[in-house]
Amino acid sequence: MNIWQSTSIITWLLAPFSLLFWLVSQIRLFLFRKKILKSYRSPVPVLVVGNISVGGNGKTPVVVWLVEQLQQRGVKVGVISRGYGGKSKDFPQLVTNQSSAEMVGDEPVLIVQRTGVPLAISANRQQSIELLLNQFKLDLIVTDDGLQHYALQRDIEWVVVDGIRRFGNGFVLPAGGLRELPSRLQSVQAIICNGGKAQPNEHLMTLEPEFAVNLRTGEQKPITDFIGQECVAIAGIGHPPRFFNMLENLGVKLLKTQGFADHQAFEPAQLKALAAEQIPLLMTEKDAVKCRTFAQQNWWYVPVSAKFSPESTACLLEPILKRLGK
């Protein structure tokens, strides 16, 4: 939300509630650390990929990148997710290539389709881990989000920061967009900066598109084929302008853009009304998993891949591999 990027009279009116939010979260964290509130220790190491702010920071591309890197190095990895946006009430549940994004959430389906990783969803992280370990022999559990879920003990914490928006106005909810203060970053093992300019203690990540995929046929086109072409773009992610800016920076001529709420379910008529049949409709990969069943001929999704420097790649992976004895 733009209101969280600066301070205004609304910020100060909400500040007392932010103070209350911060106090409650600190008391809760203290109770977990003192073992007054129970937490679960997984039989295998747990790595959390999370953030300290709300909105799209790029966690899912990091999870996909991490899983692929570990798979290439022989690590048997599983992923757990809350399954935000899904309607299913059957938990815990394994997600497969045939799972419906409407039922289990868009991000879990995307991760499984990209990596083939064993993935379970549930609000109860312990149940998800136990389900995975009962069915797969795993070396490591990666949790997509859940930095503030202190009922799950963790061995490694990565935090993804939006390199453009950073920490907004610096307030926690509801006066600002932070779940925890930036001082929380002092205790994590890695800070990943998504775009913008990374600080000295951060690893810069870029999200790079290489091609577009037709939702109906699976045909792939180089993304350069859309340079100068008139298109319409939609994005139902945490921060839609990031996707639109990426397309415009590539040279795509956007006639219209439409942002939707993160994890929002789409109605066919809702999207068909946005673009004439001859105009390409571009969307994110996360949106595509919800639209394939009613996609039109000229609908395309643009997958992005996380890219790190060789130095950052080594710095991020070596502590994990060392811990696992790989």
UniProtKB/Swiss-Prot annotation:
Pathway: Glycolipid biosynthesis; lipid IV(A) biosynthesis; lipid IV(A) from (3R)-3-hydroxytetradecanoyl-[acyl-carrier-protein] and UDP-N-acetyl-alpha-D-glucosamine: step 6/6. One of its GO terms (cellular component) is plasma membrane. GO terms for biological process: lipid A biosynthetic process; lipopolysaccharide core region biosynthetic process. Keywords: ATP-binding, Kinase, Lipid A biosynthesis, Lipid biosynthesis, Lipid metabolism, Nucleotide-binding, Transferase. SUPFAM superfamilies: P-loop containing nucleoside triphosphate hydrolases. Pfam families: LpxK. It catalyses: a lipid A disaccharide + ATP = a lipid IVA + ADP + H(+). It comes from the Bacteria. Belongs to the LpxK family. This is Tetraacyldisaccharide 4'-kinase. It comes from Actinobacillus pleuropneumoniae serotype 5b (strain L20).
